[in-house]
């Protein structure tokens, strides 16, 4: 549940795509970095956007977990192992965070009708990196939202979007996990 905060990514893959072979997925798995990048697109510097995210309570105690892509990479490992039945660790992820994204990068993306987003992807390779995403792409969400697109063998692309960063979102996902554990224990 804590993969995606208030967005039930694992539940969706487990239940809604049951019987479907997921061949790849990509998405925004860290609401904090999405919030920072959204604020940068609205004219803030990276530093000011980070300070604002801290004031809102979105940033991990160790900010490098968010801005250097460690949080997104850890979630990518969980998803790859759970959904794709891979056997990967954090060491298998190529990771580039948002620390070096500049206002110039943001403006360049905007001039291409795109936005810079920290995207975690599981194709042949596992990658977390800032990428230009076209404004019409369903992954181009703003604020603390998370989004993930599953590419499945028969159903094609399916995207789910929901709240990512924040105390209530995390609490919701933990409660969902606890209820799942309780249900599983009741079956035994």
Regions found by a protein language model. Name each.
Residues 19-25, 124, 145-146, 154-157:
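Short coil/turn connectors at secondary-structure junctions
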Residues 4, 8, 20, 44-48, ...:
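Conserved active-site and cofactor/substrate-binding residues in soluble primary-metabolism enzymes
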Residues 136-188:
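ATP-dependent carboxylate/acyl-activation modules
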Residues 42-46, 83-90, 180-186:
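Short helix-capping/linker segments at secondary-structure and domain boundaries
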Residues 1-2, 13, 28, 32, ...:
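Fold-independent oxyanion-binding glycine-rich loops
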Residues 39, 50-147:
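Substrate-binding/catalytic subdomain of NAD(P)-dependent oxidoreductase enzymes
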Residues 23, 60-67, 160-165:
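A short glycine-threonine-serine/GTX helix/turn-capping micro-motif
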Residues 2-59, 70-71, 78:
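Rossmann-like NAD(P)H-binding beta-loop-alpha module
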């Amino acid at each position: 549940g804590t993969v995606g905060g208030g967005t039930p990514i694992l539940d969706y893959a487990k239940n809604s795509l049951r019987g479907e072979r997921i061949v790849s997925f990509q998405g925004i798995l860290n609401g904090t970095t999405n919030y920072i990048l959204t604020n940068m697109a609205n004219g803030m510097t990276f530093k000011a956007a980070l300070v604002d995210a801290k004031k809102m309570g979105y940033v991990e105690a160790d900010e490098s977990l968010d801005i250097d892509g460690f949080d997104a990479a850890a979630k990518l490992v969980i998803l790859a192992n759970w959904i794709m039945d891979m056997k990967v660790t954090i060491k298998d992820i190529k990771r580039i965070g948002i620390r070096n994204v500049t206002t110039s990068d943001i403006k360049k993306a905007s001039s291409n009708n795109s936005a810079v987003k920290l995207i975690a992807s599981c194709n042949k390779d596992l990658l977390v990196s800032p990428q230009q995403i076209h404004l019409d792409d369903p992954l181009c969400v703003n604020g603390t939202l998370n989004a993930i697109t599953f590419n499945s063998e028969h159903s094609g692309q399916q995207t789910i979007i929901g709240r990512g960063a924040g105390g209530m979102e995390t609490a919701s996902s933990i409660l969902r996990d606890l209820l799942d554990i309780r249900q599983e224990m009741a079956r035994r």
